[in-house]
Amino acid sequence: ACVSQEGLPADTVVPDNRNGAAALARHLIELGHRKFAILAGPTDLCAARDRLDGFHSALSSAGIELAYHNVVHGAFTRDGGYESTKRLMATGTDATCLFAVNDVMATGAMAALRDLGLRVPEDLSVAGFDDIPTLRDLTPALTTVRLPLEKMGEEAARLALDGETPDEPRVIPVQGEVIARESTAPPTRS
């Protein structure tokens, strides 16, 4: 059994990126946000696409339209988040909340906003995805989706040891958890 290795001829356990991003979107909507921007990562990365699709799906279900110009693709890195945020802000976005499809991009986004003289969350809420350990060092602390890495490892071990040999490899999605922190707050403007 594998973790996050779809396409191999073996059972695999994967994070449920789509539903995790949808849960995060619902949380942000509950805070009062209606205008969103997304740092969507590279278009050829499955995890980035799933997170974008899940977030967008939850917005659509709530009757919230996502403006095309508020979706910016860039590298899945801190610098990718920084540059994507600078491009986004140069368009004059009216978003009150920025979702970066991974925490590393969110870290770059927060640095870009700081360099532009904007405050998180007072001027723009920021959320990420992954709950990487270095988030403890960010100020303000980042709202994110925590990947259940321990649970994924346990499930992979269970699959490897269960003795079953299915005809087709199984793909087992594991749900993440929204971790609300100080980088998101109700919007101060509509």
Q: Where would I find each of the regions flagged by the language model?
A:
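Bacterial carbohydrate/catabolite-sensing allosteric modules
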Residues: A1-S190
